[in-house]
Amino acid sequence: MTKIALQQDRPLDAIVLGRAGVDLYAREANTDMADISGFNKFVGGSAANIAVAISKLGGKVGFIGCVADDAFGGYVRGYMTEQGINLDGMMTDNSGSRTSVAFTEMKPNDCTVLIYRNKASDLTLKPEQVDPAYIAQSKMLVVTGTALSESPSREATLIAMEHARRSNTVVVLDVDYRPYSWRTDVDASIYYGIAAGLSDIVIGNREEFDMMETVLAPGNTDDDATADRFLRANTQVVIVKAGELGSKVYCKDGHKFQQGIFRVEVKKPFGSGDSFAGGLIWTLVNGGELEDGVKHGSAAAAINVSGNSCTEAMPTKEVLFDFIETREQDL
C-alpha cells in the first residue's frame, strides 16, 4: 500500500487554485436546451467543485482564485464561505471582467453545455496576488489546469506551484483540459508540461494525456508509456482516468494498480472528475493510503453523476462510506 508524505502540522489540508463560477442546470431532465423552461443556480467551476468536495468530506480547505465585482461573484463568495472554505486567497477583480457562467442540459450523455467565459475573472489572477505564506499553511496545493490557459493567471499558477515546492507543500495537478480555452494543443502541451514537472501527483484522462504528449509522443495511446514519461522530475504519482474502465495508477517506485468504477444511474456526465479528486485528496491529507484514496474518489464520482448538480451532489463522509459499504456487500 502507498502513502504520500505530507507536512501534517498545518492548519489547512488543501488549497485549491483555479476557477469558481456559476452553473445553471436545466430544471427538466432529458430535455434539449431550446425546450428548457428554466434553470437552477449553483456554484461551479472545477476548482470550486474540488474545494467543496473536500470540505463536505470534512477537510479544511483554502482557495486561490478570482471572481468579478458583480452579483455572481458575490454569490460564489457567499456560498463558498457557507461551505467553510477559507477565502484568504480569493481576489475580486473590478476591471470589467465577469464571473464565468455555464448553462447545461441534464442528460446522461450527449449533453449540451454553453459556457460564457469572455473576459473571465478567474483568468485575471496575478502573480503578485499569490501569497507564499498562505500556501505554506497547507498540506497540499491542488491546481486545476484551466488556470494555465491565459496570462496573467498562467504565471500566477506557475508561481504558486513554485511557492508550494519551496514550502514542501505537495502539489497536485488536475489537468482539467478545456480545448476552447487554448489556441492549439501544442500551446497547451507546453504549459501543461511545465506544470506537470512541478507536480507530485498528476491526474487526467486519456484524452488529456494525449494533449500533453502532442509534442513529445504524438499518437501514443499506451498508458504505461505515458506514466513512464511523466514520472520524472518531481512527479511521484500519475493517475490515468478511463471513464467506465476505471482508473490506472502509477507510482514512481514502480508500483501500479487499477480501480474500477461504481455503477450508478447517471443523470449528467460532468462533476465526476472533480468529485474523484476531492475524495482522493481528502483521503491522502488524512493520512490514508493511495489505494483507498482512489477507491474513495471513484465512489464519490459515482455519487456525483447520479445527482442533480456538481457542488450540491458532493458526498459527506457518512454518505461516501455508506455508499461503499452497500456496494461492497452487494458484490
Curated annotation (Swiss-Prot):
Catalytic reaction(s) noted: 5-dehydro-2-deoxy-D-gluconate + ATP = 6-phospho-5-dehydro-2-deoxy-D-gluconate + ADP + H(+)
Transmembrane regions listed in the UniProt entry: none
Enzyme class, spelled out: transferase
GO MF annotation, one: ATP binding
UniProt-listed GO biological process terms: inositol catabolic process
Pfam families (alphabetical): PfkB (PF00294)
Role description: Catalyzes the phosphorylation of 5-dehydro-2-deoxy-D-gluconate (2-deoxy-5-keto-D-gluconate or DKG) to 6-phospho-5-dehydro-2-deoxy-D-gluconate (DKGP).
Entry-linked PANTHER family: 5-DEHYDRO-2-DEOXYGLUCONOKINASE, HEXOKINASE FAMILY MEMBER
UniProt record similarity statement: Belongs to the carbohydrate kinase PfkB family.
Name of the featured protein: 5-dehydro-2-deoxygluconokinase
Gene: iolC
